[in-house]
């Protein structure tokens, strides 16, 4: 009874809800049901460094892998690399992140024993969870960059650049890829809150 009174569970649901909303407006998110001696805000602050580290590492992995892969898929459209990557993108998009995480833990962590499956503190502990979180985003941005580049390749400025005699590498990187990155950068920026909220440790 004392615990119910401390947590406010003896009040009607709507009263508890409005008390919680009013508390949130003042920065008070209530008391943790898991550990009543701690506040929810305190628990969030305690987990924030690890959460930001995981989200930041995942974001770097997304950028480092999706941009060059999407670029190569567009340049070598319908080639063997493009077909393989499109197949992998289709498979990874269809697989939920928790299932991918379990497969990676079982294969890389348990069977091969290359990386730790739990714990925190070193860069090796970040690889599996970061890659698991990043995988679905990588698939999304590979498709986005590839499609944007293929669309930009049809634009008039590419024809003019070829007429001017610019090197093909310069046209691809300085013009097509640069113009294709605008929507991708916006999408990546919009996915940061989702990335952080989805990686709360």
Residue ranges and their predicted role:
Residues 1-10, 46, 63, 72, ...:
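N-terminal signal-anchor/first transmembrane alpha helix
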Residues 1-18, 34, 112-128:
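Hydrophobic alpha-helical transmembrane segments of membrane transport/permease proteins
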Residues 12, 16-20, 24, 39, ...:
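Generic alpha-helical secondary structure signal
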Residues 46-81, 120-201:
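Alpha-helical transmembrane segments of integral membrane proteins
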Residues 86-147:
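Membrane-water interface segments at transmembrane-helix boundaries in multipass membrane proteins
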Residues 6-67:
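An internal, D/E-rich "acidic patch" concept
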Residues 2-5, 19, 23, 42, ...:
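Short amphipathic alpha-helical coupling elements at transmembrane boundaries
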